[in-house]
C-alpha cells in the first residue's frame, strides 16, 4: 500500500480553519504566537496528578462525590475535543498530525487546543482517512489517556471506549449533514477498540453501555445515546438527554 501523501502546513491550517467554523469543539488553533503562553500542556496527557486534579474539579462542578463519574465525563469531553476537529478536517481530505498538539482547560469553557507545528497527510478516501485518524486520535491520544486513568480511578475499558465512540458519533449532530463525515465516523466505529460499542442507525448512535452521567445529583439525565434508554419508536424523535 502506498504511503499517504504529506499535506503542507497551509493545507492543514485551511482544513482546521474550515473545521473550526462548525463550532468551538471543532477548533484547533495554529497561531504561532501561542508558543509564548506557558499554560499550554503537551498532549497526550500522561501526568496522573494533573488528570486527578482535573477530575476533582469536574466532580466539584458536577456536584458529585463519585470520582469515577467525573473521570468518565472528563475522558468523554477530551475525546470529543480530539475527534471533532480531526474528523471534520479528514472529511475535507486532510488529516492533521497531532504530535505537536497542546491543550489548556479553564472551568466553564471547552478544552482549548493548539497545534504547534501544522503538518499532516492527504486522505484519498474513507478507508485511508480512517487509517490516519485512528492512528492520530486512538493510538496517539486516547490509548495513552486510557492507560493513565487507572492510576487515579477505576473505570472499565468498555465504558471508556463507549465514551470515545459516543464522542465520535456526537460530532455528527453539529453542522449540516455531511456524507463524507458520516462515512468516516461509521468506518471508525467498525474498528477496534470502538467496534461493538454501539450502533449508528437512522436515529443516530446508541451505545451499549453508559457514561454514568445519570449518577450526577440530584438525578442526572440519561444521555440521548445511552444504552439504558429504550430505542425510539417509528416516527418518534430521538430521545434528548445530555448532549
Regions found by a protein language model. Give the residues of each.
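Cys/His-clustered metal-coordination modules, chiefly Zn-binding fingers
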Residues: 173-243
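Generic N-terminal leader/targeting and pre-domain segments
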Residues: 1-67
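Hydrophobic, aromatic-lined core segments that form the binding pocket/scaffold
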Residues: 39-202
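Generic hydrophobic, helix-prone segments enriched in Leu/Val/Ile
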Residues: 4-5, 9-20, 90, 142, ...
Amino acid at each position: 500500500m502506498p504511503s499517504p501523501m504529506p499535506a503542507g502546513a497551509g493545507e492543514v491550517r485551511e482544513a482546521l480553519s474550515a473545521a473550526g467554523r462548525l463550532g468551538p469543539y471543532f477548533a484547533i488553533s495554529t497561531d504561532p504566537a501561542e508558543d509564548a503562553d506557558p499554560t499550554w500542556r503537551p498532549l497526550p496527557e500522561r501526568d496522573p496528578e494533573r488528570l486527578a486534579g482535573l477530575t476533582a474539579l469536574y466532580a466539584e462542578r458536577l456536584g458529585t462525590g463519585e470520582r469515577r463519574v467525573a473521570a468518565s465525563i472528563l475522558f468523554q469531553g477530551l475525546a470529543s475535543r480530539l475527534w471533532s476537529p480531526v474528523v471534520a478536517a479528514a472529511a475535507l481530505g486532510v488529516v492533521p498530525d497531532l504530535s505537536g498538539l497542546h491543550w489548556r482547560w479553564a472551568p466553564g469553557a471547552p478544552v482549548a487546543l493548539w497545534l504547534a507545528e501544522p503538518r499532516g497527510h492527504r486522505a484519498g478516501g474513507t478507508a485511508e482517512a480512517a487509517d490516519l485518524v485512528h492512528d492520530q486520535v486512538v493510538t496517539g491520544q486516547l490509548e495513552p489517556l486510557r492507560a493513565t486513568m487507572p492510576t487515579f480511578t477505576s473505570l472499565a475499558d468498555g465504558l471508556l471506549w463507549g465514551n470515545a465512540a459516543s464522542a465520535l458519533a456526537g460530532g455528527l449532530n453539529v453542522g449540516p449533514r455531511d456524507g463524507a463525515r458520516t462515512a468516516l465516523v461509521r468506518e471508525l466505529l467498525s474498528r477496534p477498540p470502538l467496534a461493538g460499542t454501539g450502533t449508528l442507525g437512522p436515529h443516530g448512535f446508541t451505545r451499549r453501555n453508559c457514561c454514568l452521567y445519570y449518577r450526577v445529583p440530584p438525578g442526572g439525565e440519561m444521555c440521548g445515546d445511552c444504552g439504558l434508554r429504550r430505542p425510539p419508536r417509528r416516527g418518534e424523535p430521538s430521545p434528548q438527554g445530555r448532549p
